């Protein structure tokens, strides 16, 4: 059984997890081509290898939407209301159009179903009425689907993770300032080991948690 260990002491975000998984692939350049071939509309995916302390190097993802690069650490505003809102059905429609194995599609859908359920509990409304903010944007869909595709390609059968560092302080969202972890993220982390810190910023995002 192939087991993956994730050190999440500094949190978990979709783009960072995708870069970490890509670093494990024997041919990252070929894998980036497969990620691009998923066919997320208007999206260009590239990656570069960067120095990473004394341990060596790591892959950093670059996602461009219609020629504009999204902020790689957009978890700072994943709850922002300054973005086009995407419904659960809207995200599912995008996933249904992607050129990916059904098994990968099902895993990506499961991630978004978990997010929708957590948002439903946090806001006290039916899942059908949930509107995703940043997590419904195309770069987040790339993060989620890309991670699911990489896990399948790498033939990972079991994932073990350290306690997840969630950060601290507050995060700004459409409903004002919320403590970290935000309510929806806290629901997503139920059953998992997590810890406050390090620092006073949001380290575990609504996409990183369910992934």
Q: What feature does the model see in each segment?
A:
Residues 6-20, 132-155:
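Conserved phosphate/anionic-ligand binding catalytic regions in large, soluble enzymes, centered on
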Residues 9-10, 37-39, 51, 136-138, ...:
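Acidic, glycine-rich active-site loops and adjacent beta-strand->loop/helix elements
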Residues 23-123, 182, 191-209:
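Glycine-rich nucleotide/cofactor/substrate-binding loop typically near the N-terminus or early
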Residues 24-33, 152-162:
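Phosphate-handling active-site elements
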Residues 116-134, 138:
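Alpha-helical transmembrane cores and adjacent cytosolic helix/loop segments
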Residues 156-211:
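Mobile "lid/hinge" segments at catalytic clefts and subdomain interfaces of large enzymes
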Residues 1-4:
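Extreme N-terminal starter segment of soluble prokaryotic enzymes
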